[in-house]
Amino acid sequence: MIDMEVGIVGGGLAGLVAAISLVEKGVDVSIIGPKSKDSNSYLAQAGIAFPLVEGDSIRIHVLDTIRAGKYINDEEVVWNVISKSTEAYSFLVSHGVTFTGNELEGGHSHPRVFTIKSETGKHVIPILEKHARELGVNFVRGFVEEIGIKNGKLAGVFLNGELLKFDAVVVATGGFSGLYRFTAGVKENIGLLIGDLALKGVPLRDMEFVQFHPTGFIGRRTYLITEAVRGAGAKLVTGDGERFVNELETRDVVARAIYLKMLEGKGVFLDARGIEDFKDRFPYVYSVLKKEGIDPGKDLIPVTPVAHYTMGGISVDIFYRTRIRGLYAIGEAASNGFHGANRLASNSLLECVVSGLEVARTILREEPKRGANDAPYNFDELGDVDSIREIMWNHAGIVRDKSSLLEGLKKLEGVEADQRLKVVAKAVLTLALEREESRGSHYRRDFPFMRKEFERPSFFHLNV
C-alpha cells in the first residue's frame, strides 16, 4: 500500500479510469459523486476515437484534431493524448470492454470511432464501475459542494458541510453544458466546482468555446441523434426537402447552418429513411424515436442544435495539474488545449481515458501530501439557476455579437444565484466578448472571420 489518500470527484469515464489506475498501484481511492449512470459518459452514444484502422495513423488523427480545433490547440497536448490511444484502447479491452464496430463521423479522415451498438457509454461505464468496486475503490454517494482550500493549500472536499480530507483531489465532474437552457447532457452539469476554483484563484481556460450538437431531438426530454447516423448516410433537409450543408462537416459548421435555417423560420429534419439497418445499428436512437411516435424508416426526424460539450474548463498542464499542489482536473472539467476551438467528434472519451491514466501516473510520481487540515466552508443555495440558463442560451449561444454579450453580462448581475455559477457564466460571456473573431464553436456575427491576432488560447483569472 502507498500511504496516500486520493479523492476523485465524479464517477464518469475519466474518474473511473483514474481510480482503477491508482487503486491497482495500492493507493487508497474514493470516488465522490452521484451514480456513474448519472454522468455524461454513460449517455455517450457514438464511441471513442482511436487511430487504429488500416490506413489511419496518429499523425492523421492529430491533423484532424487540430483542423477541427481551428489551430489554437496545444499541439504538444494533442500529440501526447493521441499517441497514447493504443494504451487507452488496451486499458479498456483488458478490463472487459468489447467494441462491436467502428464508424465514420464528421471531421474524421477515417472510420476510427470505435463503438458498442452506438450506445457505448451505457456498456463501458458499468463494466469499469464493477472493476473499480472489486478492486476496493470506495464509492461515496453525494454532492460535493466545494473544494476545501486554505491559503492556497488543499485540504480536501466538502460533502454535506463536512470536510473529507485527502492528500490529492481530482476534479472529474464534467463540463458546464447544463448551464444552457437546452442540453442533451446531464442537467446537473452546471460547472459548480469550476466556478468554485475560479473564485479561489485557479485560472479557467477557453471558456468561450461551447460546442452545440447539431442534431438534438426535443421530445419528452432532450436527446441526441448521434453523429454516426449522418455518417451512415442520413441527410439534413428543410421541410421542403432542401439540403443546405455537408452533413459530415465539423459540429460547429453543421450546428450553425441548422440554427441559421431555423432563424429563417424553416424547420430542419434528419432524413434517415435510406438507412436500411437503422434499428440494428442505432438501437437506442430507434427506441427513443419510436416512443415519440417517429419511425425513422418512414418519417423525417425534427432536429435542433443543443448545448453538448464545453471545451473550456479548469486550466491544467499536460499532466493535468492545476496551480494548487495536489489538485488535478481531468476529462471535460479540465482544459489544456487538446480540443482547441472545437472538439472533434468522439475525441472526448479518448481524452477521458488518457487523462485518467495520465493523472494517475502524475499522482504516483509526485506523491502529494495534504497541505491544510481545515478550510472555510461557504456553500449556501444554488439559487436561480434557470435564469442563468436563459441568459446563456440567449446571449452566449450559437451566434453571438457585442451588444448581445454585453446585455447578457448586465442581466447576469441581477440574478440571485450562487456566485460560482455566475462566475462560470461571466467567464464565457467575457471571453466571448474579448475574442473579436469567429473561430470554431465561437461565432461572432459582427466579426465573422478568423483573425490571426486571436490565434491563441484565452484565460479567465480572478485576482483573489
UniProtKB/Swiss-Prot annotation:
Q: Where in the cell is it found?
A: Cytoplasm
Q: List the Gene3D superfamilies hit by this protein, alphabetically.
A: FAD/NAD(P)-binding domain, Fumarate reductase/succinate dehydrogenase flavoprotein-like, C-terminal domain, Succinate dehydrogenase/fumarate reductase flavoprotein, catalytic domain
Write down how the cofactor binds this protein: Binds 1 FAD per subunit.
Reaction equation(s) it catalyzes: L-aspartate + O2 = iminosuccinate + H2O2
UniProt record, GO biological process: NAD biosynthetic process
Active site per UniProt: 251 (proton donor/acceptor)
Listed GO molecular functions?
L-aspartate oxidase activity; nucleotide binding
Q: Return the annotated site residues (Important in orienting the L-aspartate substrate).
A: 105
Q: Part of which pathway?
A: Cofactor biosynthesis; NAD(+) biosynthesis; iminoaspartate from L-aspartate (oxidase route): step 1/1
Q: What cofactors does the UniProt entry give for this protein?
A: FAD
Tell me one Pfam family matched here: Succ_DH_flav_C
Q: Which InterPro entries match?
A: FAD-dep_OxRdtase_2_FAD-bd (IPR003953), FAD/NAD-bd_sf (IPR036188), Fum_R/Succ_DH_flav-like_C_sf (IPR037099), Fum_Rdtase/Succ_DH_flav-like_C (IPR015939), NadB (IPR005288), Succ_DH/fumarate_Rdtase_cat_sf (IPR027477)
Q: Does the keyword DNA-binding apply?
A: no
Q: Which GO terms describe its cellular component?
A: cytoplasm
Which positions are annotated as binding FAD? 11-14, 40-47, 332, 348-349
The EC code for this enzyme is 1.4.3.16
List, alphabetically, the NCBIfam families matched: nadB, PRK08401.1
Q: Which family does it belong to?
A: Belongs to the FAD-dependent oxidoreductase 2 family. NadB subfamily.
The job of this chain, per UniProt, is described as:
Catalyzes the oxidation of L-aspartate to iminoaspartate, the first step in the de novo biosynthesis of NAD(+).
Q: What is this protein called?
A: L-aspartate oxidase
